[in-house]
Amino acid sequence: MSCGLNDVNVSTISLQMALWRPNESKVYLPPTPVSKVISTDVYVTRTNVYYHGGSSRLLTVGHPYYSIKKSNNKVAVPKVSGYQYRVFHVKLPDPNKFGLPDADLYDPDTQRLLWACVGVEVGRGQPLGVGVSGHPYYNRLDDTENAHTPDTADDGRENISMDYKQTQLFILGCKPPIGEHWSKGTTCNGSSAAGDCPPLQFTNTTIEDGDMVETGFGALDFATLQSNKSDVPLDICTNTCKYPDYLKMAAEPYGDSMFFSLRREQMFTRHFFNLGGKMGDTIPDELYIKSTSVPTPGSHVYTSTPSGSMVSSEQQLFNKPYWLRRAQGHNNGMCWGNRVFLTVVDTTRSTNVSLCATEASDTNYKATNFKEYLRHMEEYDLQFIFQLCKITLTPEIMAYIHNMDPQLLEDWNFGVPPPPSASLQDTYRYLQSQAITCQKPTPPKTPTDPYASLTFWDVDLSESFSMDLDQFPLGRKFLLQRGAMPTVSRKRAAVSGTTPPTSKRKRVRR
């Protein structure tokens, strides 16, 4: 099309070809749906019935560093240290077999009863004190605070003692607490030589009664990671120090291991040493200038001795009540299986007492005439407030509980029947007869206690429940914070039935 300059009604049209491009934005698919965990407040109904349960005075005595065995390898004196976990396995009575004050409280055909822990107090006896640990052959090469000429002897170990990190904690749940520590791992293709640094592996285990706490030297399996048995004190050099895995217990789907927890830790470093031995990792040359007087650098594996500092009654977590209103997880204090696990650590009462016995009498003092012994004592008193709850076992709730813990339905006599089998089963009469083929062994019966293989301090409260809350210290505190008045006598139930009204006699004035 041609046009002149004088053409007035002329317009220019620009045509552009459309170009298709694929969508460059990423498409995110929805995640795979997972089963939703609901809170116990959704399907558990709380009642207004409360019980008090308390233990007697719990005492334990032993050697603070190691267990003492007899000639037949039987333990004569157990190891009892202020730096051990005390894990109490508290067994509760079955509320479905309990004598309740109101028979119409629940329907046994469609409902079941269970306990909810709403109050706890851990009583601690014995005075405050700091326990001391050590090693007669502690691997102390130099005091790096007070430098001197390095000792080149093959054995520079010395008798060193110290106090540990100060720890107070207790964890409440219906399952045992989970601990974490570092253990010896495995190398790929077995490519390790003698003297190589062992690989580390993060390990989760159940914290049992008697396990050592983390004392300031790390949560390690010292038996496999320190073969010289002299880098740490006696009581942990062949043991595993565990630390509660708060992250895993807080992220637990059902929240059974930790309803709530309290902890207080403090530590400072008292002495600074370096360890003797051949250096496994050499210092790179670019990090220092070589010396003519000391051609070989000394030990650069530096270590320290911890200290928990002063203990005070103003910083105590024990001997005071705690009320559980809202748990950190989905389990709001429900005691599944009629059990509670209470984990306690208190290093502020870790005093080790020395005992002396005379072996030979003499007019003058002679140290060899006396035998010195070491012991540690602990004292506990546990008190709980439990609330009676009921749960209606609908098909949906039963399926949910079966997915959570099938043993609960078995204990409530609500077992799920196995799927029907259409095949015909063969059954021999004489199973021990040599005339028939060898029969498969009978599978072992599942133990009723899933924690029978673990070590706990068992506390049975089956005979210690009472509704008279005002007769116990924790019960009176519970009534006070609820604003309820103590009961003087129990109210008797009204007698059913009708009685004929008595006719009043009229007065006649004369």
UniProtKB/Swiss-Prot annotation:
Keywords: Capsid protein, Disulfide bond, Host nucleus, Host-virus interaction, Late protein, T=7 icosahedral capsid protein, Viral attachment to host cell, Viral penetration into host cytoplasm, Virion, Virus endocytosis by host, Virus entry into host cell. SUPFAM superfamilies: Group I dsDNA viruses. It comes from Human papillomavirus type 2a. Forms an icosahedral capsid with a T=7 symmetry and a 50 nm diameter. The capsid is composed of 72 pentamers linked to each other by disulfide bonds and associated with L2 proteins. Binds to heparan sulfate proteoglycans on cell surface of basal layer keratinocytes to provide initial virion attachment. This binding mediates a conformational change in the virus capsid that facilitates efficient infection. The virion enters the host cell via endocytosis. During virus trafficking, L1 protein dissociates from the viral DNA and the genomic DNA is released to the host nucleus. Coiled coil: none annotated. The gene is L1. The lineage of its organism: Viruses, Monodnaviria, Shotokuvirae, Cossaviricota, Papovaviricetes. One of its GO terms (biological process) is virion attachment to host cell. One of its GO terms (cellular component) is T=7 icosahedral viral capsid. It is found in: Virion; Host nucleus. This is Major capsid protein L1. The keyword Amino-acid biosynthesis does not apply. Belongs to the papillomaviridae L1 protein family. The keyword Disulfide bond applies. Self-assembles into homopentamers. The capsid has an icosahedral symmetry and consists of 72 capsomers, with each capsomer being a pentamer of L1. Interacts with the minor capsid protein L2; this interaction is necessary for viral genome encapsidation. Interacts with protein E2; this interaction enhances E2-dependent replication and transcription activation. One of its GO terms (molecular function) is structural molecule activity. It comes from the Viruses. Residues 489-510 are annotated as: Disordered.
